[in-house]
Amino acid sequence: MLLSSCYYDTREAPEVPDIPDSEEISFSEDIQPILNQCTQCHNGSNANPDLREGSSYNALVPVYVEEGNAEGSLFYQKLPGVGHPFDVGFVLSADDIARIKTWIDRGADNN
């Protein structure tokens, strides 16, 4: 009898700072620069979703991002530092994760 299994190390989402309601979060100015760190792999050829500028919003919403629900969004669940399945050599800062979480929770606007 042969038994085998595999597992993924899972991480709890780090404590992320609250972003005040008065602070605007813009996809183009705040989120896309964070995503640009990921385009070595998420470039339309290697790994989905395509996170290159000009493609990323439509690749993310609504397939990977559930507008208004970061915790329920696959994209948020798989961020480096939260639960990315591979060691990508970096983790996002708590501030970057907070911006992404807030952007999704506020409706994931394409602004």
Predicted regions and their residues:
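Aromatic- and Gly/Pro-enriched helix-to-coil junctions and flexible linker segments
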Residues: 6-111
